[in-house]
Amino acid sequence: MVLSAADKSNIQAAWGKVGGHAADYGAEALERMFLSFPTTKTYFPHFDLSHGSAQVKGHGAKVANALTKAVGHLDDLPGALSELSDLHAHKLRVDPVNFKLLSHSLLVTLASHLPNDFTPAVHASLDKFLASVSTVLTSKYR
């Protein structure tokens, strides 16, 4: 999916407003995903999935860091996310549908924290961005 110049601007502006809350929002999105889509818990059998657990917060920070890296490399998402793609495809073997579920949960989380900035255009741009990230992360499944 091609991101337009307007999309890139919207993504960078929105992620800039996330700022120092990225790890918290990542953890919140994971918690939201686990509650809304309980089957996603199967990939984390060794985690304490209770609200506010250190493991969920830690993984939320990893998700946020990966997305921050992706925002910084919008013109080369495959290069920026290559190692993460290998990890999820070959070692973790995460079902690709789960990336869509996490993307949805992240959009809801961002909308709840940035209501004045989450315009339809920003929503569409972030959705395209997360779909592009998901496509990259599942590209090595073949």
UniProtKB/Swiss-Prot annotation:
Any Pfam family: Globin
Question: Per its record, what are the GO molecular function terms?
Answer: haptoglobin binding; heme binding; iron ion binding; organic acid binding; oxygen binding; oxygen carrier activity; peroxidase activity
Q: Identify the residues that bind heme b.
A: 88
Q: Does the keyword Heme apply?
A: yes
**In which tissues has expression of this protein been reported?**
Red blood cells.
An annotated GO BP? hydrogen peroxide catabolic process
Is-annotated flag, keyword Endoplasmic reticulum? Answer: no
UniProt entry keywords in alphabetical sequence: Heme, Iron, Metal-binding, Oxygen transport, Transport
Q: Name one GO cellular component term.
A: haptoglobin-hemoglobin complex
Q: Which residues bind O2?
A: 59
Q: Which residues form the Globin domain?
A: 2-142
PROSITE patterns, per database record: GLOBIN
Source organism, top-level taxon: Eukaryota
Q: Which InterPro entries does its entry note? A: Globin, Globin-like_sf, Globin/Proto, Hemoglobin_a-typ, Hemoglobin_oxygen_transport, Hemoglobin_pi
Assembly, per entry: Heterotetramer of two alpha chains and two beta chains.
Function noted in UniProt: Involved in oxygen transport from the lung to the various peripheral tissues.
The Swiss-Prot or TrEMBL record describes its family as follows: Belongs to the globin family.
Name of this protein = Hemoglobin subunit alpha-2
Give the species this sequence originates from.
Bubalus bubalis (Domestic water buffalo)
From the broadest rank down, the organism's phylogenetic lineage runs: Eukaryota, Metazoa, Chordata, Craniata, Vertebrata
